[in-house]
Amino acid sequence: MNLSLSDLHRQVSRLVQQESGDCTGKLRGNVAANKETTFQGLTIASGARESEKVFAQTVLSHVANIVLTQEDTAKLLQSTVKHNLNNYELRSVGNGNSVLVSLRSDQMTLQDAKVLLEAALRQESGARGHVSSHSHSVLHAPGTPVREGLRSHLDPRTPPLPPRERPHTSGHHGAGEARATAPSTVSPYGPEARAELSSRLTTLRNTLAPATNDPRYLQACGGEKLNRFRDIQCCRQTAVRADLNANYIQVGNTRTIACQYPLQSQLESHFRMLAENRTPVLAVLASSSEIANQRFGMPDYFRQSGTYGSITVESKMTQQVGLGDGIMADMYTLTIREAGQKTISVPVVHVGNWPDQTAVSSEVTKALASLVDQTAETKRNMYESKGSSAVADDSKLRPVIHCRAGVGRTAQLIGAMCMNDSRNSQLSVEDMVSQMRVQRNGIMVQKDEQLDVLIKLAEGQGRPLLNS
């Protein structure tokens, strides 16, 4: 029996009212709650039940091409934060709206299903009132495969364009090619401009994709592992150290170091980098649940005291700061000691509940960027008052930022910090993301929703998305 949209919504809503919203749904004739376990983002191959997959796919069939508002996606983000798993691949369609491209598992919570089905009911109701305006409704035709329907709606409206010329790209394909401009009649923040931005950045990402033993990227030496992820590599020209996946990044006038979460074997080198840099702030965006997951191999290096080779580290928590939307920043002080070297104190900002491959809101991002900037400025002033030689060295006193891979959450924060700097008022979003990608790797600003946050921040400043 194929449930209609209204029947499916009614059954799901009833179960949510019975406080089963966090359970995954299952479907055999009627909808039921799987109360035996919590949502784990499983596929059939990793242990999801067939009835869970049937439920998830049935919901998906009703929400293909449905426009999700910012309020809808905020509700889905609440679920992502709660379970520390992002189950949804979303794509922006402009004006803060998104569509669901696909699920990342064969499970779906009943609460999330309710959010999606209510969005479908809203659009269906609106379509009835505008039958003659079918061009505004892209509802999924019965019998059309879900992915085919989604793909037809999401195809880019403009062909990919080559990356723009910029001084740092002489070693990359596409350098020196002519720049394309957006038509003057296009809204600077509308769907056409966003699609053009996405197209240009996708082209650059593909150009920068690493080949086997690619000379553009740092290669492991001496048998030691260098990269957490095979496809997320470290630009050789801007590498901080030969044994770390870490890069000097300069976006406009904003200088930082972006790196991956250090491997256990890299901790001594990582601490040495922090000390030599006279790091004014270390921003760790990897969540506490990621660090606790032993499968990820992420040593809890900044919240605990310890000895790493010749380096001794003492950690002390100082305060906790709310950033909004329930996102919290824990503040620590790391004291790094090594025989024959100056003792270095590094402030740490740890955001412990920002899940991987997601975006926090523009408001939270602004608050985090301001906190990191203010912390760094206080420390820089201390070094300046002591007459430190690091003040005159452009390679030092840089905030060090990492999440897990050092490309998604990390790049979202760096982009916001760049926009906080009044010296960068002429930079477009295309400029900022392109500079990050060229200087580290093509995956910087990993997810569409992370780019959407930077776009929203830019729009609030009247900053262009594209270069003219």
Curated annotation (Swiss-Prot):
Q: Where is the composition biased (Low complexity)?
A: 130-140
Q: Where is it localised?
A: Secreted
Query: What is this enzyme's catalytic activity, as reactions?
Result: O-phospho-L-tyrosyl-[protein] + H2O = L-tyrosyl-[protein] + phosphate
Q: Which residues form the active site?
A: C403
The chain positions of domain Tyrosine-protein phosphatase read: 152-461
**Name of protein:** Tyrosine-protein phosphatase YopH
Q: What is the protein's known function?
A: Essential virulence determinant. This protein is a protein tyrosine phosphatase. The essential function of YopH in Yersinia pathogenesis is host-protein dephosphorylation. It contributes to the ability of the bacteria to resist phagocytosis by peritoneal macrophages.
Which parts of this chain are annotated as the region Disordered? 127-194
Mind listing the UniProt keywords for this protein, alphabetically? Hydrolase, Plasmid, Protein phosphatase, Secreted, Virulence
Question: Which Pfam families does the record match to this protein?
Answer: Y_phosphatase, YopH_N
Q: Which Gene Ontology CC terms are recorded?
A: extracellular region
The organism's superkingdom is given as Bacteria
Q: Which PANTHER family match?
A: RECEPTOR-TYPE TYROSINE-PROTEIN PHOSPHATASE, TYROSINE-PROTEIN PHOSPHATASE 1
